[in-house]
């Protein structure tokens, strides 16, 4: 990382590892609040760790999940939509509580393979096209 000019990331990772060892033994915490208390951990990273490491139902709010949600429900998506409570509430309500890890992986795959950002989405191959507002209007 240092040759890439990312020395600050090395320092963050070091500080984070040190705090994890001091505060939690050697176990990465499973509680979102504990993760957020660590240096360099954002809301998204904390949610991703809870979901992918611990299979806890945490929403992943990013441009991809917001784009899919906007298209599904026919909502206008703006740069600020990631911070919009309406999108957060919808994304949270849709999480599969029994298999949140699989659900979030599927959502990210959908965003990268079918519900594309810069190209027209591939609605014909979309598993949710029958109830997607965007697909019905295209």
Features from the language model and the residues they span:
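Catalytic cores of DNA base-excision repair glycosylases
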Residues: 1-137
């Amino acid at each position: 990382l240092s040759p890439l000019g990312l020395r600050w990331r090395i320092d963050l990772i070091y500080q984070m590892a040190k705090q994890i060892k001091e505060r939690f033994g050697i176990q990465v915490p499973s509680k979102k609040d504990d993760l957020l208390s660590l240096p360099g951990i954002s809301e998204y990273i904390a949610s991703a760790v809870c979901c992918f490491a611990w299979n806890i139902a945490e929403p992943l709010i990013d441009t991809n999940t917001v784009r899919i949600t906007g298209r599904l429900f026919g909502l206008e998506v703006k740069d600020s939509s990631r911070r919009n409570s309406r999108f957060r509430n919808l994304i949270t309500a849709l999480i599969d509580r029994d298999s949140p890890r699989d659900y979030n992986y599927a959502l990210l795959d959908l965003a990268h393979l079918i519900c594309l950002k810069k190209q027209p989405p591939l609605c014909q191959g979309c598993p949710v096209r029958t109830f997607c507002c965007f697909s019905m209007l295209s």
